[in-house]
Amino acid sequence: MLDIKWIRENPELLDQALAKRGAEPLSQSLIALDEQRRAVVQDMQDMQSRRNSASKEIGAAMAQKDMALAEKLKAEVASLKDTLPAAEEDERRLSAELTDALSRIPNIPLDDVPVGADEHDNVVARVVGQKPGWNHTAIEHPEIGEALGYMDFDRAAKLSGARFTVLTGPLARLERALGQFMIDLHTSEHGYTEVSSPLMVRDEAMYGTGQLPKFSEELFKTTDGRWLIPTAEVTLTNLVSGEILDQEKLPLRFTALTPSFRSEAGSAGRDTRGMLRQHQFWKCELVSITDAQSALAEHERMTACAEEVLKRLGLHFRTMTLCTGDMGFGAAKTYDLEVWLPGQNTFREISSCSVCGDFQGRRMNARYRNKDGKGTTFVHTLNGSGTAVGRCLIAVMENYLNEDGSITVPDVLLPYMGGLTRIEKAS
């Protein structure tokens, strides 16, 4: 969430930032709403001040036996008491309207974010590795998995409908191995603390990380009012909501391997085959809670941690700097990691790493005590996939495909595979 004080002082900067994201200017409507609220607050304060002073004057009038004045003052106090509740209700209504309006405004892009309309305007930051050197025909993962006999979309549809997958045998183990490898790497070498947290959260948690109120249609909600997390970013970031941390203890780095749940409401007709876009999928999430001074360096570090997963798997990928029109709602800058999928003959996103400034910290009311002792500051937050497990499984299947249809297990996953070095067709 943005600071209304900053908007009052920098209306042109807000509108310029919104224009970069392809949105309409909002500064004047926000400032007008805030002025209404502030006027009501001033009226309330004036009435409260007059009520207090009139109450004191009643005593003085009574002491001087001026009963007429005392009665007049009593009537004034009574009138003010009757008027104040309506003013207080106006203030609550206007404050709620302003908060709601502010909660729907996206984050301000950093100055070095390329300006653009959509994914076609993203910029390549670096390319790592090479395409597979084999000469046999590339095949997409649904055909590979079904031919092996370990990937079943029909039974998944029978159980749950579209956009679900059933994995069995060694392919299920390979998916599990990928998740274990990621969480082990990030905890043992990258300094992240593993967290096991709920998969269902309250409205406040979804609000804190920016999913609510704007994106409720993309989420799953339980009958008792809780939300299934679309990413562990929600739980890991909200661990510090409402808290005041010590700056000396920052950054806090958390990671979790969890299922994620998304309705894919805006993805009708996109990636309907296979595992690329699922309602339920495993993801290893990275979250950092840091101070304003360290956030940009932490962003580069987090991105490097996600890249290391793909490097150790020997996968060809590129890191993209997202343009203003393709960034997520809460991001100030985002790197996307896109892995090469031979079966599709293209790169596909496998991780997004974003720095959010104090956008989420303000929504969560999470602060840190400045080490110089001068007050508190909203925390800066970062989140990234380290990485999406299902998409990583797809990448391994397509890049480690052998001519006979089997899949070679990447060396880094062998310790997790119980001696299995190759996944072959089910007998």
UniProtKB/Swiss-Prot annotation:
Homodimer. The tRNA molecule binds across the dimer. Keywords: Aminoacyl-tRNA synthetase, ATP-binding, Cytoplasm, Ligase, Nucleotide-binding, Protein biosynthesis. It holds the Pfam family Seryl_tRNA_N. Catalyzes the attachment of serine to tRNA(Ser). Is also able to aminoacylate tRNA(Sec) with serine, to form the misacylated tRNA L-seryl-tRNA(Sec), which will be further converted into selenocysteinyl-tRNA(Sec). It is found in: Cytoplasm. GO terms for biological process: selenocysteine biosynthetic process; seryl-tRNA aminoacylation. Pathway: Aminoacyl-tRNA biosynthesis; selenocysteinyl-tRNA(Sec) biosynthesis; L-seryl-tRNA(Sec) from L-serine and tRNA(Sec): step 1/1. This is Serine--tRNA ligase. It catalyses: tRNA(Ser) + L-serine + ATP = L-seryl-tRNA(Ser) + AMP + diphosphate + H(+); tRNA(Sec) + L-serine + ATP = L-seryl-tRNA(Sec) + AMP + diphosphate + H(+). The keyword Nucleotide-binding applies. Its EC number is 6.1.1.11. PROSITE patterns: AA_TRNA_LIGASE_II. The keyword Protease does not apply. PANTHER family: SERINE--TRNA LIGASE, SERYL-TRNA SYNTHETASE. GO terms for cellular component: cytoplasm. Its main location: cytoplasm.
